[in-house]
Amino acid sequence: MGRGVYTLALRGLAPLIWLWMWRRARRAGGQWELFAPARFGRAGARAPAPLAAPVWVHAVSLGETRAAQPLVQALLERGLPVLLTHTTATGRAEGERLFGAAIGRGQLQQAWLPYDFPGATRRFLARHAPRCGLLMEREVWPNLLAAARAQGVPMALVSARFSASSLRQAGWLGQALREALAGLDRVLAQTDEDGARLCQAGANAYTVTGSLKFDVALPEAQLRVGHAWAGATGRPVIALASTREGEDAMFIEAIGALQAHRAATPRPLILLIPRHPQRFDEAAAQLQAAGLAYARRSAGSGEPGPHIDVLLGDTLGEMPFYYAAADVAIVGGSFARLGGQNLIEACAAGTPVIVGPHTFNFKDAARDAIAAGAALRAPDARTALDWALQLLAEPARRQAMSEAARAWTAAHAGATRRTLDALEDWLG
């Protein structure tokens, strides 16, 4: 499929794509502005004047925005103007939370990435005229990269990852993807394997700079509050972190096995933290239907009472708090076939980690964390919960895993510096 056929297909499928996004937006809440002028590369009536020659960073959603934090912060500290684009409302909200001060002083602007129509991408680049574009992780769009080439905007894929399954799935885009990847001026890969697969798919060359996720600084205030909160509960805590579709039901069923521990003193408290806010109410309904006593973190009622089985983590931006509060973290996305969620943040907090069998989005990180003694891999949700209970009974083993987790994340830090070094001639 060449780029022309890709564009025709995109135009034909656009109504279905917009319907899917509308449904997602309706569940998630927030201001998605699916048909705002900016989504088509146009300046709206209230759009601010663009920054002069900004460094443009695209972070599609929540996870990518968090991962981009150390890079964006480093650019801001150098005094550079930054244009930060997103596709989802959760990503944009996280950007506002992380970089509110820079937005307030006019050094950073946020915008929607336009849909990948040729005219929209041309208008976007002509309006903002970035000195360079940095696409986070996997955001390769054929028409966007073609427009950047035509307008002389150098483009890099940073903290790039590309799994074996991504390589297989890329085949249907054919020539359009090969041309897009070949049009990247630089590919800064997380690992040699990621870079090699990107070259198989069409990129010309790559440099390994590592994952920016290892450089994300966890807020000390949240860590302190999390530790204090856990101490005040007087109970051991297991976090079910970043659970995805279908996993809440698995774990809620497994939590039933904790009934045998009701007589234990103190009884374990479960933190259930769905990955996406649109599923908070759904998880609450499942807990209610299962007959589990639960409270919602958003209710702000302080430490849950001893009768509470589960605290539903229905807040955004508090993952460091949850990890600091937990004695053990079971990281979701890896028990359903979804590739896993970020385990690096939990390890950075010094929390022992258990992952499931499906970690292809974090293949190297999961493998290395397990080898370092920072994490365990369980075959299913029930086993993961059983292992977490065993760890609660073995403080020396938990402490060893905690120390290994911190050492492992510290050993892999430095991707921000390496990324900046690789882009130095673009940044001026």
Swiss-Prot record:
What does it catalyze? lipid IVA (E. coli) + CMP-3-deoxy-beta-D-manno-octulosonate = alpha-Kdo-(2->6)-lipid IVA (E. coli) + CMP + H(+)
| Compartments where located | Cell inner membrane
UniProt-annotated binding residues for CMP: 274-275, 316-318, 342-345
Q: Which UniProt keywords apply?
A: Cell inner membrane, Cell membrane, Lipopolysaccharide biosynthesis, Membrane, Transferase
Stored InterPro entries:
Glyco_trans_1, Glycos_transf_N, Glycos_transf_N_sf, Kdotransferase
Q: Which SUPFAM superfamilies match?
A: UDP-Glycosyltransferase/glycogen phosphorylase
This enzyme's EC code(s): 2.4.99.12
Q: Which domain of life is it from?
A: Bacteria
Pathway terms, separated by semicolons: Bacterial outer membrane biogenesis; LPS core biosynthesis
A single GO BP: lipopolysaccharide core region biosynthetic process
Q: What is this protein called?
A: 3-deoxy-D-manno-octulosonic acid transferase
**Taxonomic source organism:** Bordetella pertussis
